[in-house]
Amino acid sequence: YKRQEYIISEAMNALGIPTTRSLAAVSTGESVYREARLPGAVLTRVASSHLRVGTFQFIASKGDNSAMKKLADYAIDRHYKDAFRNKNPYLEFLKKVSDRQASLVAMWMNVGFIHGVMNTDNMTISGETIDYGPCAFMDTYDSKKVFSSIDTNGRYSFKNQPYVAQWNIARLAETLLPLIDEDLNRAIVKATEIVESFNATFDDYWLKGMRLKLGITNDFPEDQSLAIEFLEIIEENELDFTNSFLIIYDDRSDD
């Protein structure tokens, strides 16, 4: 996994997709047991920060609102300073993290990347891809494809990635409720609006990327249905995801 993380994180960086990167991998001299006995190693990651949705869940589990405020203030100061200028910085923080994740997952979908294990501990507050375990770039396009051997129900399948991301954002929202509004019901209403807007935000980012891949230079209302139909065709015919777009590019170049 360490070698895979180094290679794929560098590929993601070269593709312009926000990602952690690998600084070093050091052998421990011990064995670890996965599918088989493997040599142990420690990977050092470089990132804007290692704050994750899971970090907020851990603090929330302590029931200490002052500690949660310190964590949220630190995260805002480190990643989203503009949020402090908003009358409700914690709601704005949630909005910015949601937007950053919608953009990130749209980029994954545009290049056929399957993360594999999108739990809350693998969603960064900064919006960088992290933890390249059972991940891969698809060859033959299959929207239901999974790459984790334990994902027998397809929770983290390619097509489910936007929905899991939204679910993770909802978990982040839960941890921020005491900071968003002293009245719990008002806080829920405000946070829910942002969580529910995730899908539309994702769709906008995804379609922008698909227009670029399909060579669509002008925006038309039917572009989304065209992009979806294209994916349905290559899935039905079991075509390679990346090469199908490359063929379009080559045809345009010939013209």
List where the protein language model places each region.
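Regulatory N- and C-terminal appendages and interdomain linkers associated
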Residues: 152-255
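Catalytic activation segment of kinase domains across protein kinase-like and atypical kinase folds
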Residues: 31, 37-40, 110-115, 119-178
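Conserved ATP-binding subdomain of kinase catalytic cores across diverse folds
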Residues: 2-87, 125-128, 156, 167-169, ...
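Beta-strand segments within the central parallel beta-sheet cores of soluble alpha/beta enzyme folds
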Residues: 23-26, 119-122, 188-192
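Membrane-interfacial amphipathic/re-entrant helices at transmembrane-helix boundaries
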Residues: 86-95
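A generic secondary-structure signal for well-formed alpha-helical elements
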Residues: 13-19, 26, 75, 79, ...
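Active-site alpha-helical segments that house and flank conserved acidic catalytic motifs
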Residues: 5-6, 10, 102-115
